[in-house]
Amino acid sequence: MAQLCELRRGRALLALVASLLLSGAQVASRELDVHESCGVSKVVGKCRASIPRWWYNITDGSCQPFVYGGCEGNGNNYQSKEECLDKCAGVTENTTDDMARNRNGADSSVLSVPRKQSAEDLSAEIFNYEEYCVPKAVTGPCRAAFPRWYYDTEKNSCISFIYGGCRGNKNSYLSQEACMQHCSGKQMHPFLTPGLKAVILVGLFLMVLILLLGTSMVCLIRVVRRKQERALRTVWSTADDKEQLVKNTCVL
């Protein structure tokens, strides 16, 4: 009888553990689905089609149109605004964190939704002025039309341009305010503009060229002098020989 009770308790315990594991797997799957479908940013893709689609902007809590290239997208890609809202309406930046806390009672290692990059975020990283603020605007090979801003070091201001959606650089900002916050007055040392760099490079090239020409002239002068010295030695040696022959003739 005691063995039967222990067997039943063991089965009940196994059933409870299996139920908890299944519940945890379902919650984790739901978190991942919400993150991939609503939490990530839009991806235009590398292809060059122009397909109108919708994506959920978790920061604004709204569905917004974009142009999809046709390949290598992600789950945050919907054919209509209604489909986007049905899937993601009400999802916020803290949704996945709240779900993780409810499951574990504390912060978990589930991927968090990326937030907008601010000036404080960049200051916490190793800020590379020449990487984030110096390069010229790059539209890229893709054919989307995203309004962006880049920092012009020669004008010390942010200028708007159209970003194609792929293969850009880090000097590309969503707003003029973000661009100015990141780059205006942030250089940590006297900065050389591209024009000044070109002048310096040309000057260095001319200095090296003059140095090489001067060295060549010195070597040429030395060679000429050596030849002249050898020629003079040859002349004097011939005259001495003639004089010695005359003396020998007189003696005979």
Curated annotation (Swiss-Prot):
One of its GO terms (molecular function) is serine-type endopeptidase inhibitor activity. Residues 1-27 form the signal peptide. The record marks 48-49, 143-144 as: Reactive bond. It is a single-pass type I membrane protein. Residues 28-197 are extracellular. InterPro entries: Kunitz_BPTI (IPR002223), Kunitz_BPTI_sf (IPR036880), Prtase_inh_Kunz-CS (IPR020901). The chain crosses the membrane at residues 198-218. It comes from the Eukaryota. The keyword Cytoplasm applies. Residues 219-252 are cytoplasmic. Keywords: Cell membrane, Cytoplasm, Disulfide bond, Glycoprotein, Membrane, Protease inhibitor, Repeat, Serine protease inhibitor, Signal, Transmembrane, Transmembrane helix. GO terms for cellular component: Golgi apparatus; plasma membrane. Disulfide bonds join 38-88, 47-71, 63-84, 133-183, 142-166, 158-179. CDD domains: Kunitz_HAI2_1-like, Kunitz_HAI2_2-like. Gene3D superfamilies: Pancreatic trypsin inhibitor Kunitz domain (4.10.410.10). Glycans are attached at residues 57, 94. GO terms for biological process: basement membrane organization; epithelial cell morphogenesis involved in placental branching; establishment or maintenance of cell polarity; negative regulation of cell motility; negative regulation of cell-cell adhesion; neural tube closure. Its main location: membrane. It is found in: Cell membrane; Cytoplasm. Interacts with TMPRSS13; the interaction promotes the phosphorylation and cell membrane localization of TMPRSS13. Inhibitor of HGFAC. Also inhibits plasmin, and plasma and tissue kallikrein. Inhibits serine protease activity of TMPRSS13. Inhibits serine protease activity of ST14/matriptase in vitro. This inhibitor contains two inhibitory domains. This is Kunitz-type protease inhibitor 2. It comes from Mus musculus. The gene is Spint2.
